[in-house]
């Protein structure tokens, strides 16, 4: 997959301030504030920065954490996992494989069949209904 690269000014021109803060500066939206937290619409969630498909709605579940949660990405190649030791914690950050947008984190406390919980910021996503 060819990487999508843009300048800071190009990202700022195409993203709103919250999207830029979360996707490009590794911020986090407030829990329970995102538009996709409780959404049950059937479709595919794409990266807001580059439109790459990231998650299928069939893998979305209510984890109660305040952010959209999925038990698997649409493909293993859709994202990159990075060790994150910020804020005094050890976590695994997930970023878009195509454009390096920060999406959220993955935790080992999800449901079967994977046992994983991809905790993703809504502002990083664009849901395309089926």
UniProtKB/Swiss-Prot annotation:
Pfam family, one: SelR
Cofactor dependency: Zn(2+)
Binding positions for Zn(2+) per the UniProt entry: 47, 50, 96, 99
Record-annotated active site: 119
Catalytic activity: L-methionyl-[protein] + [thioredoxin]-disulfide + H2O = L-methionyl-(R)-S-oxide-[protein] + [thioredoxin]-dithiol
InterPro entries associated with the record: Met_Sox_Rdtase_MsrB, Met_Sox_Rdtase_MsrB_dom, Mss4-like_sf
Annotated keywords: Metal-binding, Oxidoreductase, Zinc
EC number: 1.8.4.12
Cofactor annotation comment: Binds 1 zinc ion per subunit. The zinc ion is important for the structural integrity of the protein.
Protein family according to the UniProt entry: Belongs to the MsrB Met sulfoxide reductase family.
NCBIfam families attached to this UniProt entry: peptide-methionine (R)-S-oxide reductase MsrB
Name of the protein in question: Peptide methionine sulfoxide reductase MsrB
Gene that this polypeptide is encoded by: msrB
